[in-house]
């Protein structure tokens, strides 16, 4: 747990203290009083809405969402450090909750940095307004994971999941596994090969896939 204020901005100190209070006053007591739900097979018990609503209320759920869409503003120069600091604080109460939030931040930053404007306008308001809106980053496959982004850009390291343009629609076929928020997300970023033989950096595309997409 980060205990020193050295190098932290006033904004970061305030966020850290808010998260620390959230863990001490809400997360830890909730986990202690509801530990049996850890073993429940009921999907409704996997991630209690009460926790997400409280995380939403204090602004940590929407850290990667632009302020114009209702997100929590973060200094871009120290954004990564802020994410790490808050993740550490939340993990003190529950590592699973921290991972849930990290996935939201990761995908939100992707949307913010590379998604076209019309997709930002479509999805960011939904993410910002719905406390139960989770996001998921679908990279890992049965035969490999993030190591594919290492600098050996050869065709053999490409995704087995493939996407083909048929008419005006992309059709994705393949398998993903070990996907954080996989059971609960409402929107997924799915990585798939679109140019076989071109290598990872030039032959892979990312697709936004809503949960209710047929297939």
Predicted stretch roles:
Residues 1-101, 119-126:
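Amphipathic, small/basic residue-rich leader segments at the start of a protein or domain
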Residues 12, 23, 86, 116, ...:
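Buried hydrophobic positions in well-ordered alpha/beta secondary-structure cores of metabolic enzymes
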Residues 98-120, 145-147:
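N-terminal glycine-rich flavin-associated loop
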Residues 131-146:
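A short, Trp-centered hydrophobic/proline-enriched beta-strand micro-motif
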Residues 144-146, 152-155, 170:
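Hydrophobic, small-residue-rich alpha-helical packing segments that form membrane-like cores
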Residues 161-164:
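A structural signal for short hydrophobic beta-strand segments in well-ordered beta-sheet cores
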Residues 173-215:
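A short core secondary-structure module
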């Amino acid at each position: 747990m980060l205990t020193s204020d050295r190098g932290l901005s006033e904004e970061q100190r305030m966020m850290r203290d808010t998260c620390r209070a959230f863990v001490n006053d809400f997360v830890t007591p909730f986990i202690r009083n509801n530990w049996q739900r850890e073993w429940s097979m009921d999907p409704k018990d996997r991630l209690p809405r009460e926790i997400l609503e409280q995380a939403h209320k204090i602004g940590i759920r929407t850290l990667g969402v632009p302020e114009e869409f209702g997100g929590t503003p973060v200094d871009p120069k120290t954004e990564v450090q802020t994410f790490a600091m808050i993740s550490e604080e939340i993990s003190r109460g529950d590592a699973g909750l921290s991972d849930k939030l990290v996935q939201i931040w990761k995908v939100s930053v992707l949307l913010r940095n590379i998604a076209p404007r019309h997709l930002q306008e479509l999805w960011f308001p939904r993410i910002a307004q719905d406390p139960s809106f989770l996001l998921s980053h679908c990279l890992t496959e049965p035969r490999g994971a993030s190591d594919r982004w290492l600098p050996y850009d050869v065709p053999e390291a490409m995704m087995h999941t493939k996407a083909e343009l048929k008419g005006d629609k992309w059709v994705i076929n393949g398998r993903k596994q070990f996907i954080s928020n996989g059971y609960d997300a409402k929107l997924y970023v799915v990585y798939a090969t679109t140019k076989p033989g071109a290598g990872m950096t030039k032959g892979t595309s990312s697709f936004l896939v809503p949960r209710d997409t047929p297939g």
